[in-house]
A protein has these predicted regions:
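Extreme N-terminal basic, low-complexity initiation segments
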Residues: 2-9
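Short, Lys/Arg-rich, polar N-terminal cytosolic tail immediately upstream
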Residues: 21-39
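A structural signal for multi-pass alpha-helical bundles of membrane permease subunits
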Residues: 35-37, 41-329
Length: 329
């Protein structure tokens, strides 16, 4: 034991002065050099980042590049043929695809109208002293987000059924009106989708805004009160400007979620075949062409158009919000 301690101490002294101990074999020297290299300040950060880079490249970069190349091909079970821009030319005259774009744009617009101001209002109420049992209300509003889309979509399909046994038609009949064919008419079908979206995501967006409100310094509100500001003025000139980063984030993810919506529509109409395509979205059309009709090249072209639309909308939104402007000195 004393001998091993002495050898270890002696080895440490040798390495401290950059000398090689004469009694260490080459294999041990190689291990020490590798260990020293990996634990150096220049290399260690990259070692920890490598797993993320590999996973990002495998699961994001490779599929994206593959989809770009596949969008210029006609892919069948028997052969793959390069067709250049043929898939994109077909998209321009595809009326079903244009209907899907219209449905996705309408859904995205109304989700922005409903799922930004109302969750912000709920967050302000939860942050004030006007509401009691705040924990209960937060749980009630957030619990729908924990429900599976498959289950919630099935429940809403039963609620909005065209028969008189549906909950929504019972409510309509109680008001003295005739039952609606909710999921067979364009505007009522979109209304059902929006009710499902608001039910699921109001609590999530409320928590985003609530976290933004918690980061605002309360001394700003106290200073506003001293200056004679009322509740609306404090909200207008203190809360809204300081909630801008949170609002931009919620707006960005809402745009993406609106364009990428698929499963809610799929479950609400029990498949991807809504009457006259009133519930067909861009991702739903991508699924129909790629999976149901086995036309992967055309489906990839649909996906590339969706990517471009999402990028353009987000860039325009960020430019309008002044995100890219440099701060003036």
């Amino acid at each position: 034991s004393r001998k091993s301690n002495f050898i270890a101490l002696k080895r440490g002294r040798y390495w401290r002065f950059g000398l090689r101990p004469p009694f260490i074999n080459k294999k041990e020297v190689r291990k020490l050099k590798i260990k020293k290299f990996l634990y150096s300040q220049k290399v260690a950060p990259y070692v920890f980042v490598i797993p993320f880079i590999l996973s990002f490249a495998i699961f994001w970069i490779y599929p994206l590049c593959s989809s770009v190349f596949m969008s210029f091909e006609k892919i069948t079970p028997l052969e793959t043929k390069f067709v250049a821009l043929e898939n994109y030319k077909k998209l321009l005259s595809d009326t079903v695809f244009l209907t899907a774009i219209k449905n996705s744009a309408t859904y995205m617009f109304w989700t922005l109208v409903l799922l930004i101001p109302f969750p912000m209002l709920f967050a302000v109420l939860m942050d004030s002293n006007l509401v009691k049992a705040k924990g209960v209300w937060k749980a009630v509003l957030y619990m729908p987000a924990l429900t599976s889309v498959v289950i919630s979509g099935t429940l809403f399909r039963l609620m909005f059924t065209e028969y008189s046994t549906g909950q929504m038609n019972k409510l309509v009949m109680a008001l003295g009106m005739e039952p609606f064919k909710w999921l067979k008419v364009g505007w009522t079908g979109m209304a059902a989708l929006l009710v499902l979206a608001c039910w699921r995501w109001t609590g999530v967006n409320m928590l985003y805004f609530l976290s933004g409100l918690k980061s605002i310094d309360t001394s700003l509100y106290e200073a506003a009160e001293i200056d004679g500001a009322n509740g609306w003025q404090k909200f207008r000139y203190v809360t809204l400007p300081l909630l801008r980063p949170t609002t931009i984030y919620v707006l960005t993810i809402s745009i993406y979620a609106g364009l990428a919506m698929f499963l809610e529509s799929y479950m609400l109409w029990a498949g991807n075949n809504s009457p006259k395509n009133i519930g067909l979205t861009i991702v739903g059309y991508l699924y129909k062409r790629g999976i149901e009709k086995n036309d992967m090249g055309y489906a990839c072209a649909v996906g590339m158009v969706l990517l471009v639309i999402a990028l353009v909308i987000n860039i325009v939104q960020l430019v309008c919000n002044g995100t890219f402007k440099r701060e003036e000195d």
